[in-house]
Amino acid sequence: MSTNDEVFAKDNEFWKTYLRGRAQPPESFFERIFRYHEDHGGHFGTVHDCGAGNGPYSQKLRSRFKHVIVSDVAPGNVELAKERLGNDGFSFRVARVEDFDDIPTGSVDLVFATNVMHWVEPSRGAKAIVSQLKSGGTFIAAGFGPARFEDQKVQDIWTRISQSGGRRLIMKADDPTKILKVAVRSSRYYDVAPTDTSLFVPGTQRIHLNMNNGGLTDIVYPEDYVAAAEPSYTGPQDDEIFESEDGWSFETDLEGVKDHFATFPFSKEDPEVFAELWAELEKYVADGRPIRGCWPAKIILATRV
C-alpha cells in the first residue's frame, strides 16, 4: 500500500462485494438521523455525503434533501457514483473530508460521514465540518464496519484474522504510525469526532447499538491499541446511549464471512498468512451450521451552534 489514496480507490466489482459483505443499515438508521435533524430545527436543503465511496447512501439522502454533495478522495469512486446517481439533485467533488475551501462557509444543512471518520485527523476533520455547517445544522458520523459473531469460537477466529490483517496493513503503509491510529479509531467503540461545546450545542448524542457483547472487532493487537490510543473524544456533556436495535443481525455461511473479509483493505495483503486461520474456521463450520451475528454500530449526532 503506497499511499492512503490507494486504499480508497476501488472498482465496481469491489463495491458489489462491499454491498454483499457489509452491513446494510436498516430504515431505522436513516429515520433516526432525519428525526434528530428535524427535531433540532434543521432544514432539508443541502447535505454533504463526505467520504462517500461510490455513494451507497446518497440516494437515501436525496429522498429528503434537495441537494446532495457526494465527495470522496478517490476519483474512480466519484465517477462510479456519478454514473449511478446522475445529476438530478446531486453534485460531485473529489476531495478528502478535511478539504473544505471550495464549500461556502455555512452552506450545508447536514454533514453525513459514515465509515470514514476513523481515517480523518480529528482536529482537521472538526475544522472542516464546522466551517461548512450552517448554525443549527447537523453533523452525523457513524461506524458499522466489522461484524461480531454469536458463536465465540467463530468470533475468536475472526478476531485473529482481523488483528493479523491489521498488523500487515500497518507494516506495509508509507506512514505506519498514521495507519495504526486509523486502526485504533475504527476498533471497539469508534471513539471519533470531537464536538467541542464552543462549536456544537452541548449534549452530542453518542449512540452505541448492539454492543452488549463488545463493540467493533479490533483490527489491532491489544499492545498496539494501548500504544496508539488517543484521548477520548467523548465530552463530559455528551449523552452516551447504549441500545439494542433490530435490523442489524444476519445469518450467513463461510462464503459470507469471506465476502465480509474481502471488504477490508488488508484482505489482499499476503493471503497465505490467513490460510491457517481460514482452514481452522472451515473445519469448525464443516457441519453446515449457520453463522449468526450482528453489526455493532456507533452513531454520533451533533448540532452546530
From Swiss-Prot:
Keywords, in A-Z order: Methyltransferase, S-adenosyl-L-methionine, Transferase
UniProt family annotation: Belongs to the methyltransferase superfamily.
Induction statement: The cluster is expressed in rice fermentation medium. Expression is correlated with the production of pestheic acid. Three regulators are located in the cluster (ptaR1, ptaR2 and ptaR3), suggesting that the production of pestheic acid is controlled by a complex regulatory mechanism.
GO molecular function term, any single one: S-adenosylmethionine-dependent methyltransferase activity
EC number: 2.1.1.-
GO biological process, one term: methylation
A Pfam family of this chain: Methyltransf_11
Protein known as: Methyltransferase ptaH
InterPro entries, per database record: Diverse_substrate_MTase (IPR051052), Methyltransf_11 (IPR013216), SAM-dependent_MTases_sf (IPR029063)
Gene3D superfamilies: Vaccinia Virus protein VP39
Name of the gene encoding the protein in the UniProt record: ptaH
Methyltransferase domain, as annotated region: 49-140
Disulfide pattern: none
Keyword Amino-acid biosynthesis: no
Job description of the protein: Methyltransferase; part of the gene cluster that mediates the biosynthesis of pestheic acid, a diphenyl ether which is a biosynthetic precursor of the unique chloropupukeananes. The biosynthesis initiates from condensation of acetate and malonate units catalyzed by the non-reducing PKS ptaA. As the ptaA protein is TE/CLC domain-deficient, hydrolysis and Claisen cyclization of the polyketide could be catalyzed by ptaB containing a beta-lactamase domain.
